[in-house]
């Protein structure tokens, strides 16, 4: 069986963006899940930053994972992947120069596309954990990412959060990233189709939507007409794996069945309340 090169996988992802359809990602978090996703016919996968933090550190999504740790996991996936994989590269692990290093390392790992978001990460002293960087810095990061890539087929996607700012600010940011040369725009926190339409009508590059299964955004044909090519529903496969592991080990120990959900198990073993308390105590981070 022919195994596509990393460049060929990137070209395959570009073809998805150039199509008129909407595709749903598989959540891939290790080589086995990447192989399963490809075998089941998924057109692309995504290595989420939150999932990588759970898989590598058993830690919540507080920007604790390092670039090296993330790249190591991406490399393991890239070694066996037979489908294009998107890397959720968070904020690029620092400033614009750090973004350049991030692009170099993830390209070498075999990633087909990556997202760079404009959230102020990691959380800063005395600031809200949901604050965004200024548009100018976000533009600088996208320009730096484009400069750093060697394979022109590698897709650079600018990500912003439509839930944290008003629609005019979202339009301002996404237009700026589009003008800076981003290959696509990733939107998180879109409420419904009216919200999406207000943003999408100003853009001419492909859209990626993180919906977390939002029932208000489940019409794939309508999404496709608005320019959405990639949809991320979340990472149910990973959390199902946590639940299955817990239940299996409980059974091996002779324990009675548990009714804890996958989400509850994740919180039970990653201690998010402790991290939140440390952020308040040592950094005066505002909720």
Curated annotation (Swiss-Prot):
<dbReference type="Pfam" id="PF13714">
    <property type="entry name" value="PEP_mutase"/>
</dbReference>
<dbReference type="InterPro" id="IPR040442">
    <property type="entry name" value="Pyrv_kinase-like_dom_sf"/>
</dbReference>
<feature type="binding site">
    <location>
        <position position="88"/>
    </location>
    <ligand>
        <name>Mg(2+)</name>
    </ligand>
</feature>
<dbReference type="GO" id="GO:0019629">
    <property type="term" value="P:propionate catabolic process, 2-methylcitrate cycle"/>
</dbReference>
<dbReference type="GO" id="GO:0006107">
    <property type="term" value="P:oxaloacetate metabolic process"/>
</dbReference>
<dbReference type="GO" id="GO:0046421">
    <property type="term" value="F:methylisocitrate lyase activity"/>
</dbReference>
<keyword id="KW-0210">Decarboxylase</keyword>
<dbReference type="GO" id="GO:0000287">
    <property type="term" value="F:magnesium ion binding"/>
</dbReference>
<protein>
    <recommendedName>
        <fullName>Oxaloacetate decarboxylase</fullName>
        <ecNumber>4.1.1.112</ecNumber>
    </recommendedName>
</protein>
<dbReference type="InterPro" id="IPR023687">
    <property type="entry name" value="Oxaloacetate_deCOase_bac"/>
</dbReference>
<keyword id="KW-0456">Lyase</keyword>
<dbReference type="InterPro" id="IPR015813">
    <property type="entry name" value="Pyrv/PenolPyrv_kinase-like_dom"/>
</dbReference>
<keyword id="KW-0460">Magnesium</keyword>
<comment type="similarity">
    <text>Belongs to the isocitrate lyase/PEP mutase superfamily. Oxaloacetate decarboxylase family.</text>
</comment>
<feature type="binding site">
    <location>
        <position position="159"/>
    </location>
    <ligand>
        <name>substrate</name>
    </ligand>
</feature>
<feature type="binding site">
    <location>
        <position position="50"/>
    </location>
    <ligand>
        <name>substrate</name>
    </ligand>
</feature>
<keyword id="KW-0479">Metal-binding</keyword>
<dbReference type="GO" id="GO:0042866">
    <property type="term" value="P:pyruvate biosynthetic process"/>
</dbReference>
<feature type="binding site">
    <location>
        <position position="235"/>
    </location>
    <ligand>
        <name>substrate</name>
    </ligand>
</feature>
<dbReference type="GO" id="GO:0008948">
    <property type="term" value="F:oxaloacetate decarboxylase activity"/>
</dbReference>
<comment type="function">
    <text>Catalyzes the decarboxylation of oxaloacetate into pyruvate. Seems to play a role in maintaining cellular concentrations of bicarbonate and pyruvate.</text>
</comment>
<dbReference type="InterPro" id="IPR039556">
    <property type="entry name" value="ICL/PEPM"/>
</dbReference>
<comment type="subunit">
    <text>Homotetramer; dimer of dimers.</text>
</comment>
